[in-house]
């Protein structure tokens, strides 16, 4: 390994933000970029009525709904590091891409609305990070509002998400009385001054917990309350331990308000100091270290129509090892074909720029006219496939029906291509000619209907179907599997890649099937 490669690897940090809708993820994303000086006027995410669209809104439908469906990638410098932030759609309208993006990062930032605590979507996303024990940092947001008791919030995270909390900063007051935060490890208090939009206020720092200046700055009552709470915190919570953090067992917790531009930098300081540089990854034959000289990478997401003027698709590839250089020849392992990549892109939400070189942890965009699939591995010749980029069992299902029955062939072609791209999953029941599509977020269905029309000239509508969940099935005992298939034919379907799946009408129905056929494995995820 060259020393240049080692230095580039060491300074990269690649992370994503997980949160429930409206916990402030979009604001945090902007403020993170602001502190990294990537967006000069943060606050480009405006109310639904305004025409100044957020930096990461591409497709028409996003513009209509004021949400970011697309998982964009933003790179910015911070201190001596280069940080890659992968945006994860956070609205009710999120998709399987959100889950898969979490497989491409080395660390996650969990944003929690401190007035509400742990919410449903956060739980789901945390489950996905558990597949790889991804390290988690936590930001308790909206301290400029009235929040729940901070100790209660920590307890809730520990009990519900099964991860220990190690507070790094601690709030002084909240809402109208919010005065700032105390840093437990630096023994410093940062006094809150609201910075709105893109002004970052100079923050006044008071050294020492027992400094009389602290009482003068925040008032004696709040200063005493802080000292009392810290006694309790030190007794009741975890100390920060980097090893446990890297193992995904404890999360450092920061308090602040993204809207007020306060506290985000404390979290970023923690991120660049503690989060891992690009990590090794498993393939089906061996482990690949980031420091290896030979280039490797995998595709975790494909996005259609990022440029309204061009009907192209862009495949997002995470660089795992080596160095990408413009014009290099790479092998697409699935097809065993060599391709010259001369026009890879990097992204600063919405603006594409062509890249000359990229290192482990970076995300490249590859132009793709339907030849790249999710989970594809690219190498400099070695035949191996990265694992851990799964399909997730859909949670919502619809039947797709054609307005013109003669277009069945185009419909099937379109749906299979969209499923290879990860836009939706398609299931073809064995016992009838229905086409069932499965998704993780409601918006995926609208996207599919819109794309079938614009890209495949197929007019389709979707309607409800009596399906609650799906599981991929396999069984080591061929005879028992045949019996299972014979007796459950009406509930079996093939997915877009011709893998067999069990389509359950209810969770009870699924549990009964699992009890009745203990030798059959019902999988919630499936490797690409």
UniProtKB/Swiss-Prot annotation:
Keywords: Cytoplasm, GTP-binding, Nucleotide-binding, Protein biosynthesis. GTP binds at residues 19-26, 87-91, 141-144. It comes from the Bacteria. SUPFAM superfamilies: EF-G C-terminal domain-like, P-loop containing nucleoside triphosphate hydrolases, Translation proteins. The keyword Protein transport does not apply. InterPro entries: EF-G-like_DII (IPR053905), EFG_III/V (IPR035647), G_TR_CS (IPR031157), P-loop_NTPase (IPR027417), PrfC (IPR004548), RF3_C (IPR032090), RF3_dom_3_sf (IPR038467), RF3_GTP-bd (IPR041732). GO terms for cellular component: cytosol. It is found in: Cytoplasm. GO terms for molecular function: GTP binding; GTPase activity; guanosine tetraphosphate binding; translation release factor activity, codon nonspecific; translation release factor activity, codon specific. GO terms for biological process: regulation of translational termination. It holds the Pfam family EF-G_D2. Residues 10-279 form the tr-type G domain. Belongs to the TRAFAC class translation factor GTPase superfamily. Classic translation factor GTPase family. PrfC subfamily. HAMAP family: Rel_fac_3 (MF_00072). NCBIfam families: prfC, PRK00741.1, small_GTP. Increases the formation of ribosomal termination complexes and stimulates activities of RF-1 and RF-2. It binds guanine nucleotides and has strong preference for UGA stop codons. It may interact directly with the ribosome. The stimulation of RF-1 and RF-2 is significantly reduced by GTP and GDP, but not by GMP. This is Peptide chain release factor 3. It comes from Escherichia coli O1:K1 / APEC.
